[in-house]
From Swiss-Prot:
Source organism per UniProt: Cereibacter sphaeroides (strain KD131 / KCTC 12085)
Subunit structure: A double ring-shaped homohexamer of HslV is capped on each side by a ring-shaped HslU homohexamer. The assembly of the HslU/HslV complex is dependent on binding of ATP.
Gene that this sequence comes from: hslV
Protein family according to the UniProt entry: Belongs to the peptidase T1B family. HslV subfamily.
Protein name: ATP-dependent protease subunit HslV
Catalytic activity as recorded in UniProt: ATP-dependent cleavage of peptide bonds with broad specificity
Compartmental location: Cytoplasm
Location (main, coarse): cytoplasm
GO CC field: HslUV protease complex; proteasome core complex
Keyword Cytoplasm: yes
EC number: 3.4.25.2
Entry annotation: catalytic residues: T12
Molecular function, one GO term: threonine-type endopeptidase activity
Length: 185
């Protein structure tokens, strides 16, 4: 999506792993323009606390668009405290139907430590089947690595870090400078 309006912008891998009563969300810090790394320390994973209920969100795509969506999500969560799935469905409906929001180019992974969801501009609110999900340019690499590591006894954070390291080794738009947030219910 972002490549249509901004053909040279690339970057971001966000991965979420749910295991042992917690969810870990990890994101790399690289932002690239064409073949140039513009920034290596961007924070694409955020902790939100609307109405005192903690949520962790990671985003891929346009940063400004993602922040707009995160602000909207916070408002939806304030209107439906502790109901992450409901708030995400309401946001997805707005995102799909509102003329302004429809043009936003970002994807989100959100979790409250129990529920884990991916939100897309197509109106999708998806819950992963295997307690692992990923978005962004290196998302498929991180997802494959994490799915393989889920067969081990490693804790969620270690799975996330190892999978992100593998993605960073393969995807030129992903680096090893991670932001990692943990949340449990």
């Amino acid at each position: 999506m972002a490549e249509e309006r901004f053909p040279g912008w690339h970057g971001t891998t966000i991965l979420a792993v749910r295991r042992g009563g917690e969810v870990v969300v990890a994101g790399d810090g690289q932002v690239s323009l064409g073949q140039t790394v513009i920034k290596g320390t961007a924070r694409k994973v955020r902790r939100l606390s609307p109405g005192g209920h903690e949520v962790v969100a990671g985003f891929a795509g346009s940063t400004a668009d993602a922040f707009t969506l995160l602000e909207r999500l916070e408002k939806k969560l304030e209107a439906a405290p502790g109901q992450l799935a409901r708030a995400c469905v309401e946001l997805a409906k707005d995102w799909r139907m509102d003329k302004y929001l429809r043009n936003l180019e970002a994807m989100l992974i959100v979790t409250d430590g129990e529920t884990l969801l991916v939100l897309t501009g197509a109106g999708d609110v998806l819950e992963p089947e295997h307690d692992v999900t990923a978005i962004g340019s290196g998302g498929n690499f991180a997802l494959a690595a994490a799915r393989g590591l889920m067969a081990t006894e490693l804790p969620a954070e270690e799975i996330a870090r190892k999978a992100m390291a593998i993605a960073a080794d393969i995807c030129v738009y992903t680096n090893g400078n991670l932001t990692v947030e943990r949340i449990s219910k």
